[in-house]
């Protein structure tokens, strides 16, 4: 089961107050519902491929309105042969939709979120939970990027949902997609805050555990890469220095060098793997800084280049 599916399963088991149940139902029906007429009656179908969400809608409708609700199961005939669950409401569909602030006067569908429905902070959370159950997805925290989104068919609802989410300082943004609109989060911290707001506390803990391990692994990898790069740089410089010192030895002999250069040349030949700092601690005159050692080695490089190019050699 994917992380998103586990999160939704957790949410469908939450107990909610009556006011919050209406807010959650409103989001679920507004985003996944469709209306039709049968025998001069309004028929509401709420469709989902998630059995737990279908049970949630069925239970909330029965609890809030004590009406007859049908739960139908259909088999998809296309590539994804998942079951499709339809929660069907025939009895009192119109007054229920009006109570949930979905249906307005003259059978006009309200595409914005009603302020009356989300006056309380708990109801705002519940509407967001319903919206996530209806059209939400979230990447597994182990994947390369953090991403949570909620799909809406209509721009008005999408913008309204984005404003609602940002009342919780989630920094959500909107984007137009091919068949609708999304409100999305890209920051890991904001995704965990959203999971907390909608009540997915177990999923939040799992997300944070994975994120901490992942971030720590990335930090270690960056550190190792940095150390490896520095080591490669040190080894490369050491090999170049040894090659130049051997050239000097072959052409004029190390004894021709001033004492300070001769000593550091011999130390570099004998200890090719050590750092400049370690070389500075080996000189006979006492500890010398990295910059001091580097200055002497650069002088040896200059002498080697002068010998290669046939120039007169300056040993000072």
Swiss-Prot record:
It holds the Pfam family HTH_WhiA. InterPro entries: Homing_endonucl, Sporu_reg_WhiA_N_dom, Sporulation_regulator_WhiA, Sporulation_regulator_WhiA_C, WhiA_LAGLIDADG_dom. Signal peptide: none annotated. Gene3D superfamilies: Homing endonucleases. Keywords: Cell cycle, Cell division, DNA-binding. GO terms for molecular function: DNA binding. Residues 275-309 bind DNA. GO terms for biological process: cell division; regulation of sporulation. Transmembrane segments: none annotated. Belongs to the WhiA family. PANTHER family: CELL DIVISION PROTEIN WHIA-RELATED. NCBIfam families: DNA_bind_WhiA. Involved in cell division and chromosome segregation. This is Probable cell division protein WhiA.
